[in-house]
Regions:
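N-terminal secretory signal peptides and thylakoid transit peptides that target proteins
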Residues: 2-20
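A glycine/proline-hinged amphipathic helix-loop "lid/cap" segment
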Residues: 33-125
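Short beta-strand element of the alpha/beta-hydrolase
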Residues: 130-139
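Catalytic nucleophile-loop/oxyanion-hole region of alpha/beta-hydrolase
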Residues: 146-147, 154, 166-200, 339-341
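Hydrolase active-site cap/lid region
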Residues: 218-273
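Short beta-strand/loop motif that positions the catalytic acidic residue
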Residues: 296-298
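Catalytic histidine-centered segment of alpha/beta-hydrolase-like enzymes
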Residues: 331-339
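Catalytic active-site module of serine/aspartate enzymes centered on a nucleophile-bearing elbow/loop
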Residues: 340-360
Length: 360
């Protein structure tokens, strides 16, 4: 993980930090920066100093993000070799082997419904906790954090939530665009449903993983299956048309999502499909009866702030129990290190889960 700090203790990597926040350190290196205006708008990249209303650690994260050099341009969709290099560069900062050596959680690889899954089990779980299952869907723009990276993120998630975690290593572009990843997530959910029952299941996803998690709810409903006990969406992508206000207004203020027009891996994932299709942009779906109680997380510097608040409003309009946590000055996917803000998000999320998972 590229943090600019030496001698970082292994446990500081995971303490009080959301999975998407950790991943954002790597993810932000894979999003291009530009000094040009957004297409069809007058927006230009801006930079304001971090506010005094957040912790020093969070301020430092924003300052470092503002100073990072622009990475190489995003490859064209047909440039398979270019995408492989892009993914390798984006994955490199995550300290996978260091995370996997941290004791306290056993991780094993399984095949479920034809998909690869990493089962992470904290040591010393009670029998009641062993009866619960957390289906975790990683982010990374539909292209990053597969393989051992997904395994490491599974371990972190299990440690944070103190539960059995099933992390889907879903297929990704360039070889496997939509709907391959969503189909993998659905296959794993269906398999877990037989073993645990819906009342004992939690589904979560961050960023692109939040997109897949939300789309999964629609697919579960459409298949006539029972929805999980609860859903957590961390800075989710819900509208692939990039129509939200914050996508333009926060251009230059979010150190993670710096791609000026937002195509890149989105275009690769779409593979020519209509971005307004609900399985691609869940915001445009019929949300009624599809979603369990849902907890959404975003920040005031997250370029997907609009995606998150619009999804929250749409869920409320569909009479779904939905809660929204907005963190001051937080960019996409969190502050990426051990900050009071990251700890507050995790604490609030765990508190929200009480009484909702397992469902009474």
């Amino acid at each position: 993980m590229s943090t600019g700090r030496k001698g970082m203790d292994r446990r500081s990597v995971i303490a009080g930090v959301t999975t998407t926040g950790i991943a954002s350190l790597a993810e932000r290196s894979a999003h291009g920066a530009s000094e040009t205006s957004l297409p069809g708008s007058t927006a230009v990249p801006r930079n304001f100093p971090p506010p005094s209303t957040i912790s020093k650690a969070a301020q430092d994260y924003l300052r470092k993000g503002a100073m990072q050099p622009p990475p190489a341009p995003v490859p064209a969709p047909e440039d398979v070799a270019g995408w492989h290099a892009y993914v390798a560069a984006g994955n490199a900062p995550l300290p996978v082997e260091m995370i996997l050596k941290i004791p306290g959680v056993d991780v094993e690889t399984r095949q479920m419904g034809g998909a690869t899954v990493y089962l992470a089990t904290p040591k010393g779980l009670s029998e009641a906790d062993r009866r619960k299952a957390h289906l975790s869907i990683h982010g990374g723009g539909w292209v990053l954090f597969g393989g051992r990276h997904a395994m490491a993120l599974a371990k972190i998630t299990a440690m944070q939530y103190g539960c059995v975690t099933y992390a889907v290593d879903y297929r990704m572009p360039p070889e496997h665009p939509f709907p391959a990843g969503l189909n993998d997530c659905f296959a794993v959910y269906r398999a877990l449903l037989k073993d645990f029952g819906a009342r004992n299941m939690l589904v979560s996803g961050g960023s692109a993983g939040g997109n897949l998690a939300a789309a999964l709810m629609l697919k579960i409903r459409d298949a006539g299956l029972e929805k999980p006990s609860a859903l957590i969406l961390q800075t989710p992508v819900t509208d692939l048309t990039n129509a939200g206000d914050s996508w333009q207004v926060l251009y230059g203020l979010d150190p993670v999502l710096r791609d000026p027009d937002g195509v890149g891996s989105t275009e690769l994932y779409l593979n020519g499909n209509d971005p307004r299709q609900p399985y691609l942009s869940p915001l445009f779906g019929d949300l009624a009866t599809a979603f369990p109680p849902t907890h959404l997380i975003t920040g005031t510097r997250d370029r997907l702030l609009s995606d998150t608040v619009r999804m929250h409003a749409a869920l409320r309009a569909a009479n779904v129990e939905a809660d929204l946590y907005v963190s001051e000055a937080m960019p996409h996917a969190g502050f990426g290190q051990q900050t009071p803000e990251d700890q507050a998000i995790l604490s609030d999320t765990r508190k929200w889960l009480n009484g909702r998972w397992p469902r009474a």
